[in-house]
Amino acid sequence: MFLRRVHPVRLGHASQRSLTTTKSRNESTTTTVEAPQAAPSPPPDAFTEEFLRNQIKVTELQRVILGVGSSLAALVNPRRHDMIACLGETTGVPALDAIRRQMLASDEGRQILADRPRINTRTVDMAALKALPETSFGHQYVHFLEKHDITPDSRAEVRFMDDPELAYVMTRYREVHDLVHTVLGMPTNMLGEVAVKWVEALNTGLPMCYGGAVFGAQRQNYLRHYLPWALRMGRQVRPLMNVYWEKRWEQDMAELRQELNIEELVIN
């Protein structure tokens, strides 16, 4: 710090430095003025702390290599969920950023980004949902999980991303996937999974959804029934990432589908 001799002045609170003022030829005094402290940064939320613990930082070249390698592996074996997850993280940033902007433009979406809710057996009381009326969204979600013997705890953690908020958007996409299955009325077999992927592809723009939809279809009536329905739903359904699903558990399923503009697939 540099000190300089000046004439006595009235000191404000806008600076924090030591000023030496002249009292006499042989005497001086030093006055310290404290500036207001900057507000401390808020501590990271629980999701950000977890993400930073698991994050694997990669260079742009490594990201390209991971993207190409995971896409080839997913093409060879569409059931390699780890490769599909890696593909989404390494290629999905532009789409995730668009989803974030879309969420910020919606009251419900902004609330999701602020709260950062999680969907797993530690955060959702499955027994309470099961006790809801049979026509409720929450009850039918638990029925879907039990019928297909799956758990919301099986979703892969996001590792290869830089932005914690975009990492949350990706996590949210993964954790609501089974909720989308439920509200669309789609099973977890190949046809159901492919149909849901098409809806998600058109609804979110995530590139790995297009990949799963294109390369996963292996059954004949896919082109006849499932694909036309999925394409129509993908275009007409309201943005699914803007739905605060946890506040809809008690809502009647038929009412929720009508609100989201979802039509069930009917095969005669």
Swiss-Prot record:
Topology of this chain in the membrane? Peripheral membrane protein
Per UniProt, where does Zn(2+) bind? 177-178, 181, 193
Give residue spans, biased composition: Low complexity.
20-38
> What are the record's GO terms for cellular component?
extrinsic component of mitochondrial inner membrane
Give GO terms for biological process: ubiquinone biosynthetic process
Transit peptide (residue range): 1-18
Q: Which UniProt keywords apply?
A: Lyase, Membrane, Metal-binding, Mitochondrion, Mitochondrion inner membrane, Transit peptide, Ubiquinone biosynthesis, Zinc
Do you know which Pfam families this protein is assigned to?
Coq4 (PF05019)
Question: Annotated pathway, please?
Answer: Cofactor biosynthesis; ubiquinone biosynthesis
Per UniProt, the ranges with Basic residues bias are: 1-10
Complex and partners: Component of a multi-subunit COQ enzyme complex.
UniProt-listed PANTHER family: UBIQUINONE BIOSYNTHESIS PROTEIN (PTHR12922), UBIQUINONE BIOSYNTHESIS PROTEIN COQ4 HOMOLOG, MITOCHONDRIAL (PTHR12922:SF7)
Protein name in the entry: Ubiquinone biosynthesis protein COQ4 homolog 1, mitochondrial
